[in-house]
Curated annotation (Swiss-Prot):
Stated family: Belongs to the RTT106 family.
Compositionally biased tracts (Polar residues): 85-97
Annotated source species: Aspergillus fumigatus (strain ATCC MYA-4609 / CBS 101355 / FGSC A1100 / Af293) (Neosartorya fumigata)
Subcellular location: Nucleus; Chromosome
Originating gene: rtt106
Biased composition (Acidic residues): 398-408, 424-440, 449-459
Transcription recorded as keyword: yes
The protein's name in its UniProt record: Histone chaperone rtt106
Keywords assigned: Chaperone, Chromosome, DNA-binding, Nucleus, Transcription, Transcription regulation
Annotated Gene Ontology cellular component terms: chromosome; nucleus
Region (Disordered): 67-99, 373-459
Length: 459
């Protein structure tokens, strides 16, 4: 009887949660369940588990302090907190409190599959007043990561390659997180974000007042998220692939009727996909993402051009770097089938010519007006195309001369002439001497096959 009484009292104790355990293991539901199971089996150990939970919470709090201290050390912490509470934090503030601070929501979407910086399902949130874009843990309700809206520099909406069902990856690239421009010393960069949405309607998307959106109005999840982002972005807009810029020569692998906008490539041993967009070249979707914005590209060239593949070399320079800061990024094993499309894209945007790099940077900052720059860029592009054709013809002429030099025997000038047409020997004989023979060789070298045609006509 007494044993049954103990069990009933234990069950009664566990019918309500223990606050210390809830706080300590909020982010680890499986571990929290094991703790409660252990308490159920040995209820006399409840005080012990509470002490362990409190100690765990203190450790978590201790480890959460260092990231915020360097930012606020020299900048009046009290004033900083007041700014955060008013929603007016400065754009260059790097404290996690910017995105974690409590703020009214304008939009949220549950069960969003994130790939970067964490691979898990989270709730996507956009705070009101162009505040921040962030991801919240659906179990612990804690903000995992985020970025202030005014720190976002590029937003891409790209079709996920090689999927049987249409999906889209949203890629958020904050300032100093494009893989090209490093943050200034002492300044922290927000992490890039990548999440995936399906082509169908949003199943769990809500407005700021809690009303469900996107479920019955015919708007897809991709279109809904894109619209919300465009309404809140201050420095850019969502960029999608445009077939006027580039489309792959090969269709989607699993959806043959659809055009593909990606190209497979390798950076070192890491495989990824290249997208040639209206604002730059993107390589993803694995860490670290790289976005080659037009204003950072010095020039683009080809190397290791083989029968089936070729490499793309992109020379880039950071915004705050001098001429000596230029670095090259090689993207290899690109299929030859896409060479023509990539080459047309590069020439259309003037990326093959390093002399146009300053014009691209000027356009980024809107120096001298956009229209004048576009006209200048168009003229420069035409000149660049003509120059490339001239260089091509020059290379062909040099190759032809090299082949003729291989046939030339320096041992005897007179005998070397005999290696040509025998009819020419019969007509000309040896009367004109060595100087005339050398003159004939020069004519043949310059005119090639045309010299042979002239000789035959004379016969």
């Amino acid at each position: 009887m007494s044993f049954a009484t103990i069990n009933r009292s234990a069950t009664k104790t566990l019918s309500t949660s223990i606050p210390a355990i809830e706080d300590a293991f909020a982010a680890e539901p499986s571990l929290k369940k094991r703790v409660y199971d252990a308490i159920e089996n040995t209820p006399q150990h409840v005080p012990l588990f509470e002490d362990i939970a409190k100690y765990t919470s203190s450790l978590l709090a201790r480890h959460a302090i260092p990231p915020t201290q360097p930012v606020e050390a020299d900048e009046a912490p009290a004033a900083k907190k007041r700014k955060l509470q008013n929603g007016n934090a400065a754009g260059d503030t790097q404290s996690p409190g910017n995105v974690e601070a409590e703020a009214p929501l304008q939009f949220s979407m549950q069960d969003v599959s994130f790939a970067i910086p964490q691979r898990k399902k989270l709730t996507l949130e956009v705070t009101a007043g162009r505040g921040s874009l962030r991801a919240r843990n659906q179990t612990s309700k804690e903000v995992e990561f985020g970025v202030p809206m005014d720190r976002i520099r590029h937003v891409l909406c790209l079709p996920v390659p090689e999927k049987s069902q249409r999906q889209f990856n949203f890629c958020i690239i904050p300032q100093y997180s494009d893989g090209i421009n490093p943050p200034p010393e002492g300044e922290q960069a927000f992490e890039s974000m990548v999440w995936t949405v399906s082509d169908g309607p949003a199943k769990a998307a809500f407005s700021g007042n809690g009303q469900q959106v996107g479920a019955g109005d015919g708007e897809t999840a991709e279109a809904l998220v894109r619209r919300v982002l465009n309404e809140n972005l201050s420095h850019t807009k969502v960029v999608r692939p445009d077939e006027r810029q580039f489309v792959s020569a090969m269709p989607e692998a699993h959806r043959k009727s659809e055009k593909a906008y990606h190209v497979k490539a390798f950076r070192g041993s890491k495989e990824g996909y290249l997208f040639f967009l209206s604002t730059g070249i993107f390589f993803g979707f694995k860490k670290p993402l790289i976005f080659f914005a037009f204003e950072n590209i010095e020039s683009v060239s080809y190397t290791s051009v083989l029968q089936r593949t070729f490499n793309l070399n992109i020379a880039v320079r950071p915004h705050n770097g001098g001429e000596n800061a230029t670095q090259e990024v090689e993207l290899s094993m690109i299929d030859q089938a896409d060479y023509a499309g990539i080459d047309a894209y590069i020439k259309k945007n003037g990326l093959q010519d390093a002399s146009l790099a300053e014009a691209r940077r000027a356009k980024r900052y809107n120096i001298n007006g956009a229209k004048a720059e576009e006209n200048a860029a168009g003229t420069a592009n035409d000149n660049a195309v003509e120059e490339s054709e001239l260089q091509k013809a020059q290379r062909e002429l040099e190759d032809q001369e090299d082949e003729e030099e291989e046939d030339y025997n320096p041992g005897s000038d007179g005998e070397s002439d005999g290696s040509g047409s025998s009819s020419e020997e019969g007509d000309d004989g040896n009367e004109e001497g060595d100087e005339d023979d050398e003159g004939q060789d020069l004519v043949a070298a310059e005119l090639g096959s045309e010299a042979e045609d002239i000789a035959e006509d004379e016969l």
